[in-house]
Amino acid sequence: MLFEPPLISATLVRRYKRFLADVVLASGEEITVHCPNTGSMKNCVVPHSPCYLSDSNNPKRKYRYTLELVTTPDGDLAGVNTGRANALVEEAIRAGVVPELAGYQIQREQKYGEEGSRIDLLLSRGEERCFVEVKNVTLAEPGGQGLFPDAVSVRGAKHLRELMYVRAQGHRAVLFFCVQHTGVNLVSPADDIDAVYGQLLREAAGAGVEIFAVRATLGSCEIKLRELLPVVL
C-alpha cells in the first residue's frame, strides 16, 4: 500500500476521546487530527514522540489529517489506522504472501454467520468458501510478543463465534492478524486484558479455525505485509 503523497511527519501530543489526537506539525502549529482506532493503543501513545499523518486534502472534512503511524517507546513504528488492515490483508493475499490462501476470488464485507455479521474477506474457488476475519495488532510486550486485543473486545469474541459456526458448516475459516508493529516477532492472545477472548481463540483453533499472523514493513511512503509470524496460543 503506497502513500501518495508520502505521509507528513509530526510530533504526537496526546490521544483522547478515542478518535482524536493532538499533534504538532513541523511548522510548530498544533492541530487536532482524526485517530481511526477504537482500541486502547496501549504502549503506542508516547507524548512528544514522532508520528506520521496522511492529508485528505478535503476542505470539507472537520479534521483534515489522519494519524497513521506512531513511534513506540522502543523506537518501533506502529500502524494505528485500523481502517487500512483489510486492504493490507487483501493485498497480501493477492500477492501470495500466505500460500495457503492463494488461488481464490476475493469479495469484501459479505454477510455470514448466525449473529448478523459481515466477514471482512470472503474467498471463493468454485464451490469452496473461505471466510477471513482481520484483526490489527499494535500491542507489543518486551521481547517482541504481540498481543491481541489491546482492550476488552466483545465484537472480537462475536467474530470468533461466527468463524467457528462457518467452520462447523464445512467451510474454511481464517483469523488473520495484520501485525502493524515493526517490533513484533510472534502473536498471542492478551489473556490479561481479555481472558474471554483468549479462551475463545483457543477454542476456535481447536475447532479448525486457521490462524495466520503477518508483519508489515512500515514507512512514510508504504505499508506492506511481508513476513509470516508464529502464533503462540
Swiss-Prot record:
Name the record gives this protein: Sugar fermentation stimulation protein homolog
Sequence similarity: Belongs to the SfsA family.
GO molecular function, one term: DNA binding
A Pfam short name: SfsA_N
Originating organism: Teredinibacter turnerae (strain ATCC 39867 / T7901)
Superkingdom of this protein's organism: Bacteria
InterPro entries: SfsA (IPR005224), SfsA_C (IPR040452), SfsA_N (IPR041465)
Cystine bridges: none
Cited CDD domains: SfsA-like_bacterial
Signal peptide: none
